[in-house]
Protein backbone atom coordinates (compact mmCIF):
# COMPACT_ATOMS: atom_id res chain seq x y z
CA UNK A 1 0.00 0.00 0.00
CA UNK A 2 1.36 3.40 -0.97
CA UNK A 3 2.32 6.01 1.59
CA UNK A 4 2.09 9.81 1.63
CA UNK A 5 5.43 11.50 0.89
CA UNK A 6 5.91 15.27 1.05
CA UNK A 7 8.60 17.27 -0.79
CA UNK A 8 9.73 20.69 0.39
CA UNK A 9 11.97 22.64 -1.99
CA UNK A 10 12.92 26.13 -3.11
CA UNK A 11 11.78 27.48 -6.50
CA UNK A 12 15.25 27.43 -8.11
CA UNK A 13 15.19 25.07 -11.08
CA UNK A 14 18.62 23.74 -10.21
CA UNK A 15 17.07 22.41 -7.00
CA UNK A 16 13.70 21.39 -8.46
CA UNK A 17 14.78 19.48 -11.57
CA UNK A 18 16.94 16.87 -9.79
CA UNK A 19 13.95 15.75 -7.72
CA UNK A 20 11.39 15.24 -10.47
CA UNK A 21 12.63 11.83 -11.55
CA UNK A 22 12.37 10.65 -7.94
CA UNK A 23 8.82 11.98 -7.72
CA UNK A 24 7.81 10.14 -10.90
CA UNK A 25 9.36 6.89 -9.70
CA UNK A 26 7.65 7.08 -6.31
CA UNK A 27 4.30 7.77 -7.98
CA UNK A 28 4.89 4.85 -10.36
CA UNK A 29 5.40 2.62 -7.33
CA UNK A 30 2.02 3.60 -5.94
CA UNK A 31 2.93 6.26 -3.41
CA UNK A 32 0.99 9.47 -2.99
CA UNK A 33 3.37 12.40 -3.41
CA UNK A 34 2.68 16.01 -2.45
CA UNK A 35 5.07 18.79 -3.45
CA UNK A 36 5.18 22.43 -2.36
CA UNK A 37 5.50 24.55 -5.51
CA UNK A 38 5.10 28.12 -6.67
CA UNK A 39 2.77 28.89 -9.56
CA UNK A 40 5.59 29.03 -12.10
CA UNK A 41 6.90 25.60 -11.01
CA UNK A 42 3.57 23.83 -10.55
CA UNK A 43 3.52 22.52 -14.13
CA UNK A 44 6.80 20.65 -13.67
CA UNK A 45 5.59 19.10 -10.42
CA UNK A 46 2.19 18.10 -11.77
CA UNK A 47 3.77 16.56 -14.87
CA UNK A 48 5.91 14.40 -12.57
CA UNK A 49 2.71 13.10 -10.96
CA UNK A 50 2.67 14.90 -7.62
CA UNK A 51 -0.13 16.83 -5.99
CA UNK A 52 0.83 20.49 -5.93
CA UNK A 53 0.58 22.35 -2.64
CA UNK A 54 0.79 25.98 -3.76
CA UNK A 55 2.60 28.80 -2.01
CA UNK A 56 4.11 32.18 -2.80
CA UNK A 57 7.84 32.72 -2.46
CA UNK A 58 10.19 35.49 -1.41
CA UNK A 59 12.73 34.36 -4.01
CA UNK A 60 13.18 36.30 -7.28
CA UNK A 61 11.36 35.07 -10.36
CA UNK A 62 12.95 34.06 -13.65
CA UNK A 63 12.25 37.46 -15.21
CA UNK A 64 13.47 39.66 -12.34
CA UNK A 65 16.42 41.65 -13.78
CA UNK A 66 17.70 42.52 -10.31
CA UNK A 67 18.15 38.90 -9.20
CA UNK A 68 21.70 38.20 -8.08
CA UNK A 69 23.47 35.58 -6.05
CA UNK A 70 25.33 36.95 -3.02
CA UNK A 71 28.88 38.21 -3.39
CA UNK A 72 31.56 35.73 -2.34
CA UNK A 73 32.47 37.67 0.81
CA UNK A 74 28.97 37.31 2.23
CA UNK A 75 27.79 34.28 0.27
CA UNK A 76 27.21 31.96 3.21
CA UNK A 77 25.61 34.44 5.61
CA UNK A 78 23.44 36.13 3.01
CA UNK A 79 22.28 32.82 1.56
CA UNK A 80 21.32 31.53 5.00
CA UNK A 81 19.37 34.72 5.69
CA UNK A 82 17.59 34.51 2.35
CA UNK A 83 16.46 30.94 2.88
CA UNK A 84 15.49 31.54 6.48
CA UNK A 85 13.27 34.39 5.28
CA UNK A 86 11.79 31.97 2.76
CA UNK A 87 10.98 29.48 5.51
CA UNK A 88 9.40 32.15 7.69
CA UNK A 89 7.22 33.16 4.75
CA UNK A 90 6.29 29.75 3.35
CA UNK A 91 5.73 27.44 6.31
CA UNK A 92 2.56 29.20 7.54
CA UNK A 93 1.16 28.86 4.01
CA UNK A 94 1.90 25.14 3.72
CA UNK A 95 1.15 23.85 7.19
CA UNK A 96 -2.67 23.92 7.07
CA UNK A 97 -2.78 21.52 4.11
CA UNK A 98 -0.30 19.21 5.82
CA UNK A 99 -2.11 19.25 9.14
CA UNK A 100 -5.24 18.17 7.30
CA UNK A 101 -3.36 15.42 5.45
CA UNK A 102 -0.13 14.57 7.29
CA UNK A 103 2.66 12.89 5.36
CA UNK A 104 4.38 9.68 6.45
CA UNK A 105 7.75 11.00 5.30
CA UNK A 106 9.19 14.42 4.49
CA UNK A 107 11.88 15.04 1.88
CA UNK A 108 13.41 18.49 2.09
CA UNK A 109 16.04 20.30 0.07
CA UNK A 110 19.13 21.40 1.94
CA UNK A 111 17.96 25.02 1.67
CA UNK A 112 14.25 24.35 2.24
CA UNK A 113 14.35 25.12 5.94
CA UNK A 114 10.55 24.98 6.16
CA UNK A 115 10.64 21.24 5.54
CA UNK A 116 13.25 20.71 8.22
CA UNK A 117 11.27 22.67 10.79
CA UNK A 118 7.94 21.08 9.85
CA UNK A 119 9.33 17.55 10.18
CA UNK A 120 11.04 18.33 13.47
CA UNK A 121 7.99 20.06 14.94
CA UNK A 122 5.64 17.20 14.12
CA UNK A 123 8.01 14.28 14.69
CA UNK A 124 7.85 13.09 11.09
CA UNK A 125 10.82 11.17 9.68
CA UNK A 126 12.75 13.06 7.05
CA UNK A 127 15.22 12.76 4.18
CA UNK A 128 17.54 15.62 3.32
CA UNK A 129 18.13 16.31 -0.39
CA UNK A 130 21.43 17.57 -1.79
CA UNK A 131 21.35 19.03 -5.32
CA UNK A 132 24.83 20.39 -4.52
CA UNK A 133 28.13 19.18 -3.12
CA UNK A 134 27.35 17.68 0.29
CA UNK A 135 28.55 19.79 3.21
CA UNK A 136 28.12 17.50 6.21
CA UNK A 137 30.00 14.97 8.25
CA UNK A 138 33.38 14.20 6.64
CA UNK A 139 33.52 17.33 4.48
CA UNK A 140 32.39 20.86 5.28
CA UNK A 141 32.11 23.89 3.05
CA UNK A 142 32.98 26.07 6.02
CA UNK A 143 36.26 24.22 6.48
CA UNK A 144 37.11 24.04 2.78
CA UNK A 145 36.92 27.76 2.06
CA UNK A 146 37.80 30.82 4.14
CA UNK A 147 34.72 31.96 6.05
CA UNK A 148 34.64 35.15 8.10
CA UNK A 149 32.73 33.95 11.15
CA UNK A 150 32.50 37.56 12.35
CA UNK A 151 30.64 38.72 9.24
CA UNK A 152 27.50 40.58 10.38
CA UNK A 153 25.23 38.49 8.15
CA UNK A 154 26.10 35.38 10.16
CA UNK A 155 25.30 37.08 13.46
CA UNK A 156 22.02 38.35 12.03
CA UNK A 157 21.17 34.86 10.76
CA UNK A 158 21.82 33.27 14.15
CA UNK A 159 19.63 35.75 16.03
CA UNK A 160 16.83 35.49 13.52
CA UNK A 161 16.98 31.69 13.45
CA UNK A 162 16.78 31.53 17.24
CA UNK A 163 13.65 33.70 17.18
CA UNK A 164 12.11 31.59 14.43
CA UNK A 165 12.77 28.31 16.23
CA UNK A 166 11.51 29.69 19.53
CA UNK A 167 8.31 30.78 17.82
CA UNK A 168 7.86 27.22 16.59
CA UNK A 169 8.43 25.73 20.04
CA UNK A 170 11.94 24.56 19.15
CA UNK A 171 13.97 26.78 21.44
CA UNK A 172 15.93 23.75 22.68
CA UNK A 173 17.35 23.15 19.18
CA UNK A 174 20.68 25.06 19.11
CA UNK A 175 21.14 27.30 16.10
CA UNK A 176 24.54 25.81 15.34
CA UNK A 177 22.96 22.34 15.03
CA UNK A 178 20.13 23.45 12.77
CA UNK A 179 22.18 22.93 9.61
CA UNK A 180 23.31 19.45 10.68
CA UNK A 181 20.13 17.40 11.15
CA UNK A 182 20.34 13.67 11.67
CA UNK A 183 17.71 12.42 9.30
CA UNK A 184 16.59 9.00 8.17
CA UNK A 185 18.66 9.39 5.01
CA UNK A 186 20.52 11.87 2.85
CA UNK A 187 20.03 11.75 -0.93
CA UNK A 188 22.70 13.46 -3.02
CA UNK A 189 22.17 13.96 -6.75
CA UNK A 190 25.78 13.25 -7.69
CA UNK A 191 27.95 10.15 -7.68
CA UNK A 192 30.20 9.52 -4.71
CA UNK A 193 33.23 9.91 -7.02
CA UNK A 194 32.43 13.60 -7.60
CA UNK A 195 31.91 14.40 -3.92
CA UNK A 196 34.79 15.87 -1.94
CA UNK A 197 35.97 13.13 0.47
CA UNK A 198 33.28 10.91 -1.02
CA UNK A 199 34.72 7.64 0.29
CA UNK A 200 34.50 8.92 3.88
CA UNK A 201 30.70 9.28 3.88
CA UNK A 202 28.66 6.50 5.46
CA UNK A 203 25.78 4.50 4.05
CA UNK A 204 23.27 7.03 5.39
CA UNK A 205 24.35 9.22 2.48
CA UNK A 206 22.91 7.89 -0.75
CA UNK A 207 24.86 9.28 -3.70
CA UNK A 208 22.33 8.43 -6.39
CA UNK A 209 23.56 10.66 -9.22
CA UNK A 210 21.30 12.74 -11.47
CA UNK A 211 17.65 11.69 -11.64
CA UNK A 212 16.72 13.30 -14.93
CA UNK A 213 13.31 13.13 -16.55
CA UNK A 214 11.68 14.95 -19.51
CA UNK A 215 10.60 18.46 -18.53
CA UNK A 216 7.18 19.91 -19.11
CA UNK A 217 7.14 22.94 -21.38
CA UNK A 218 10.62 22.57 -22.86
CA UNK A 219 10.83 24.37 -26.23
CA UNK A 220 11.44 22.44 -29.44
CA UNK A 221 14.98 22.21 -30.77
CA UNK A 222 16.69 20.38 -33.61
CA UNK A 223 20.42 19.89 -34.18
CA UNK A 224 22.03 21.69 -37.14
CA UNK A 225 21.36 19.94 -40.43
CA UNK A 226 24.93 20.40 -41.60
CA UNK A 227 26.27 18.27 -38.76
CA UNK A 228 28.28 21.12 -37.22
CA UNK A 229 29.64 20.37 -33.73
CA UNK A 230 27.31 21.75 -31.06
CA UNK A 231 28.42 23.73 -28.01
CA UNK A 232 25.80 24.54 -25.38
CA UNK A 233 26.33 27.75 -23.40
CA UNK A 234 24.07 28.47 -20.42
CA UNK A 235 24.42 30.37 -17.16
CA UNK A 236 21.39 28.74 -15.56
CA UNK A 237 18.18 30.48 -14.50
CA UNK A 238 19.25 32.70 -11.60
CA UNK A 239 22.45 34.69 -12.07
CA UNK A 240 22.15 34.95 -15.84
CA UNK A 241 21.75 38.68 -16.58
CA UNK A 242 25.20 39.05 -18.13
CA UNK A 243 24.98 40.71 -21.56
CA UNK A 244 28.74 41.33 -21.78
CA UNK A 245 29.40 37.60 -21.50
CA UNK A 246 26.88 36.78 -24.20
CA UNK A 247 28.51 39.27 -26.56
CA UNK A 248 31.86 37.70 -25.70
CA UNK A 249 30.39 34.35 -26.80
CA UNK A 250 29.36 35.95 -30.10
CA UNK A 251 32.92 37.09 -30.67
CA UNK A 252 34.52 33.86 -29.50
CA UNK A 253 32.66 31.63 -31.93
CA UNK A 254 32.06 33.85 -34.96
CA UNK A 255 33.58 32.31 -38.09
CA UNK A 256 34.30 28.99 -36.36
CA UNK A 257 32.94 25.51 -37.19
CA UNK A 258 30.95 25.45 -33.95
CA UNK A 259 27.17 25.69 -33.80
CA UNK A 260 26.56 27.43 -30.48
CA UNK A 261 23.25 27.14 -28.63
CA UNK A 262 23.21 30.11 -26.25
CA UNK A 263 20.63 30.37 -23.45
CA UNK A 264 20.34 33.97 -22.23
CA UNK A 265 17.47 33.61 -19.75
CA UNK A 266 14.33 35.66 -19.35
CA UNK A 267 15.91 38.69 -17.69
CA UNK A 268 16.97 40.46 -20.86
CA UNK A 269 15.71 41.00 -24.39
CA UNK A 270 17.87 38.95 -26.78
CA UNK A 271 17.59 41.78 -29.31
CA UNK A 272 19.52 44.01 -26.89
CA UNK A 273 22.62 41.90 -27.51
CA UNK A 274 22.82 42.87 -31.15
CA UNK A 275 22.94 40.49 -34.09
CA UNK A 276 24.54 37.13 -33.31
CA UNK A 277 26.80 35.38 -35.81
CA UNK A 278 24.94 32.95 -38.11
CA UNK A 279 26.32 29.98 -36.18
CA UNK A 280 25.11 31.20 -32.77
CA UNK A 281 21.52 30.27 -31.89
CA UNK A 282 20.16 32.54 -29.15
CA UNK A 283 17.21 31.36 -27.03
CA UNK A 284 15.79 32.60 -23.72
CA UNK A 285 15.48 29.00 -22.51
CA UNK A 286 16.80 25.83 -24.09
CA UNK A 287 15.68 22.20 -23.75
CA UNK A 288 18.92 21.36 -22.01
CA UNK A 289 18.63 17.58 -22.05
CA UNK A 290 17.79 17.57 -25.76
CA UNK A 291 20.70 19.84 -26.65
CA UNK A 292 23.16 17.88 -24.50
CA UNK A 293 22.22 14.73 -26.39
CA UNK A 294 23.88 16.33 -29.45
CA UNK A 295 26.49 18.58 -27.81
CA UNK A 296 30.26 18.16 -27.83
CA UNK A 297 30.95 20.75 -25.09
CA UNK A 298 28.91 22.42 -22.33
CA UNK A 299 29.92 25.90 -21.12
CA UNK A 300 28.14 26.94 -17.93
CA UNK A 301 28.38 28.66 -14.56
CA UNK A 302 29.23 25.33 -13.01
CA UNK A 303 25.93 24.59 -11.28
CA UNK A 304 25.98 20.99 -10.11
CA UNK A 305 22.76 19.97 -11.85
CA UNK A 306 24.05 21.04 -15.24
CA UNK A 307 27.45 19.47 -14.63
CA UNK A 308 25.80 16.15 -13.80
CA UNK A 309 23.47 16.30 -16.79
CA UNK A 310 26.48 16.98 -18.99
CA UNK A 311 28.37 14.01 -17.58
CA UNK A 312 25.32 11.80 -17.99
CA UNK A 313 25.27 12.76 -21.68
CA UNK A 314 29.03 12.22 -22.00
CA UNK A 315 29.74 15.92 -22.57
CA UNK A 316 32.85 17.68 -21.17
CA UNK A 317 32.48 20.95 -19.30
CA UNK A 318 33.92 24.44 -19.28
CA UNK A 319 32.94 26.18 -16.03
CA UNK A 320 32.85 29.96 -15.63
CA UNK A 321 32.04 30.10 -11.93
CA UNK A 322 30.49 33.18 -10.34
CA UNK A 323 29.74 32.08 -6.76
CA UNK A 324 31.47 30.33 -3.90
CA UNK A 325 29.55 27.11 -4.46
CA UNK A 326 30.30 27.18 -8.18
CA UNK A 327 34.00 27.73 -7.44
CA UNK A 328 34.01 24.40 -5.60
CA UNK A 329 32.18 22.64 -8.43
CA UNK A 330 34.61 24.09 -10.96
CA UNK A 331 37.59 22.89 -8.94
CA UNK A 332 36.09 19.41 -8.82
CA UNK A 333 35.52 19.49 -12.59
CA UNK A 334 39.25 20.03 -13.02
CA UNK A 335 40.22 17.50 -10.30
CA UNK A 336 38.18 14.73 -11.94
CA UNK A 337 39.32 15.63 -15.47
CA UNK A 338 35.82 16.11 -16.85
CA UNK A 339 36.53 19.61 -18.12
CA UNK A 340 38.17 22.96 -17.49
CA UNK A 341 37.58 26.07 -15.40
CA UNK A 342 37.97 29.67 -16.54
CA UNK A 343 38.51 32.63 -14.25
CA UNK A 344 36.24 35.61 -14.78
CA UNK A 345 39.19 37.94 -14.38
CA UNK A 346 40.77 38.42 -17.76
CA UNK A 347 38.25 36.26 -19.61
CA UNK A 348 38.55 36.91 -23.35
CA UNK A 349 36.90 35.46 -26.46
CA UNK A 350 40.16 33.71 -27.30
CA UNK A 351 40.47 32.07 -23.89
CA UNK A 352 36.90 30.82 -24.03
CA UNK A 353 37.32 29.46 -27.55
CA UNK A 354 40.63 27.78 -26.67
CA UNK A 355 39.11 26.14 -23.58
CA UNK A 356 36.23 24.74 -25.62
CA UNK A 357 38.63 23.37 -28.22
CA UNK A 358 40.85 21.83 -25.54
CA UNK A 359 38.12 19.97 -23.65
CA UNK A 360 36.72 18.74 -26.96
CA UNK A 361 40.03 17.28 -28.12
CA UNK A 362 41.98 16.32 -24.97
CA UNK A 363 42.12 12.50 -24.60
CA UNK A 364 42.60 12.84 -20.83
CA UNK A 365 39.34 14.75 -20.52
CA UNK A 366 37.54 12.28 -22.76
CA UNK A 367 38.72 9.50 -20.45
CA UNK A 368 37.69 11.50 -17.37
CA UNK A 369 34.20 12.09 -18.73
CA UNK A 370 33.82 8.41 -19.63
CA UNK A 371 34.92 7.35 -16.15
CA UNK A 372 32.60 9.78 -14.38
CA UNK A 373 29.72 8.84 -16.67
CA UNK A 374 30.21 5.22 -15.63
CA UNK A 375 30.02 6.36 -11.99
CA UNK A 376 26.81 8.26 -12.74
CA UNK A 377 25.20 5.26 -14.39
CA UNK A 378 26.26 2.98 -11.52
CA UNK A 379 24.88 5.38 -8.90
CA UNK A 380 21.36 4.20 -9.67
CA UNK A 381 19.46 7.41 -10.35
CA UNK A 382 15.76 7.69 -9.59
CA UNK A 383 15.21 3.96 -9.07
CA UNK A 384 17.86 3.75 -6.35
CA UNK A 385 16.66 7.00 -4.81
CA UNK A 386 13.15 5.57 -4.56
CA UNK A 387 14.53 2.37 -3.02
CA UNK A 388 16.27 4.42 -0.34
CA UNK A 389 13.17 6.51 0.32
CA UNK A 390 11.08 3.36 0.70
CA UNK A 391 13.64 1.92 3.11
CA UNK A 392 12.97 4.92 5.37
CA UNK A 393 9.28 4.10 5.36
CA UNK A 394 10.04 0.56 6.52
CA UNK A 395 12.39 1.51 9.38
CA UNK A 396 11.09 1.77 12.96
CA UNK A 397 9.97 5.29 13.77
CA UNK A 398 12.55 5.64 16.52
CA UNK A 399 15.36 5.08 14.05
CA UNK A 400 14.15 7.94 11.93
CA UNK A 401 13.79 10.72 14.48
CA UNK A 402 15.17 14.07 13.40
CA UNK A 403 18.08 15.00 15.63
CA UNK A 404 21.39 16.80 15.23
CA UNK A 405 24.41 15.01 13.82
CA UNK A 406 27.08 14.20 16.32
Q: What positions do the PLM features span?
A:
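A short, active-site helix/loop in glycosyltransferases that binds the activated sugar's phosphate group
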Residues: 156-204
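Hydrophobic beta-strand segments of well-ordered beta-sheets in folded domains
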Residues: 5, 184-186, 259-260
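Short amphipathic alpha-helical surface micro-motifs
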Residues: 34-35, 109, 166-172, 186-192, ...
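Structural motif
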Residues: 98, 178-179, 223, 290
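A structural signal for alpha-helix termini and helix-coil/disorder junctions
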Residues: 100, 167-171, 189, 193, ...
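Donor-nucleotide binding loops and adjacent catalytic segments primarily
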Residues: 195-297
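Glycosyltransferase specificity loop/lid
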Residues: 1-155, 159-162, 262-406
